[in-house]
Amino acid sequence: MMAGAFAPHARRRAAVDFAMVNHAALPHLEALCRRWLPGGRRIGAEWVCGSLRGEAGESCKVNLSTGRWADFAAGHRGGDPVSLAAAVAGIGQAEAARSLARMLNVNVEGGW
């Protein structure tokens, strides 16, 4: 077989539609934050907690309208629910997007 070729029956994972997952997650972001960052609380339009580990405090903030977030103590930040899910779980963004899509019952992958 030629270098770089793949077996005819091999299946590649389809690309994830990050925009679709983020769009689906935004209306549920407060509930997701309650699950992922349980020591936090809502203050105005933000979910506020101590860090991405989810303890009480005010160093980590998630804008519930836009999905932008920052853990100011650790210097981590992101712009959407998928990046937040990835940071909280310590996984890659594609894996986080697939997991979040399953949680929200959103089909984001096309088949071959």
What do these predicted regions represent?
Residues 1-112:
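N-terminal structured subdomain of primase-like DNA metabolism proteins
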